[in-house]
Amino acid sequence: MAVKIRLRRMGAHKAPFYRVVVADSRSPRDGRFIEEIGYYNPIAKPEAEVKIDAEKAAKWLGNGAQPTDIVKKLFNQAGIK
């Protein structure tokens, strides 16, 4: 089972926010997931709001989960390597 760390879209029409989730790569974007590890709100003022549980992220990265490109950027922003 290939596991990805990716964004799950939530929110209203034209007002999205995203949850950072660990999911099987074969499941749909907004479908079933294994664990939620944070959230990302690009609409927040004055700048985008990012909150990620560093311990959970490190655990999943250590277990071989592959983050998507956007999630990699969010991890760098949050100080997670």
Curated annotation (Swiss-Prot):
Biological processes, Gene Ontology terms: translation
UniProt family annotation: Belongs to the bacterial ribosomal protein bS16 family.
Gene Ontology CC terms: cytoplasm; small ribosomal subunit
Annotated Pfam families: Ribosomal_S16
Gene name linked to the record: rpsP
One MF term in the entry's GO annotations: structural constituent of ribosome
Protein name listed in UniProt: Small ribosomal subunit protein bS16
Top-rank taxon: Bacteria
Keywords of this entry: Ribonucleoprotein, Ribosomal protein
